[in-house]
């Protein structure tokens, strides 16, 4: 967040159909005030654009890349192969195998070319946004503070959701054990 006008994170996806999932990562980045760039880049249909994007990512001021893809899902790994920035892969749910194909394509990277891989689908995109914020927070104390607040809000939501649940009342001679 040092330079508000320059994106620190890129959110890229293999197809516009991935947006319904990937917008969750953008929602998180918005919530934390992280400036980001979003774009459709296909590893298969626009490989030159993908390579140019990955090669120039650091020079363009990016600090992390969130890449979502479904099916063959080569985008995160191919970007990771062409940049030394952290790449977070989001497996997008596919029609054929419910996202298992996407997950395995992203998570099974050869040693030396890591991709931090999240869960399949919407929760994975949310966690990708949070992971990018956590990475940035190592160098931006205000983000670390916002993350603490976020975690405290999660705790409060759990406590609130527990309120309507009735507890089991034991008679004097009974125990929980």
Residue ranges and their predicted role:
Residues 9-37, 42-43:
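Glycine-rich phosphate/diphosphate-binding loop of Rossmann-like nucleotide-binding domains
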Residues 17, 102-167:
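C-terminal binding/interaction regions
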Residues 18-22, 47, 72-78, 97-100, ...:
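Short glycine/serine/threonine-rich phosphate/pyrophosphate-binding segments
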Residues 41-57:
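N-terminal beta-loop-helix "entrance" segment that forms/cooperates
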Residues 53-95:
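Glycine-rich phosphate-binding loop
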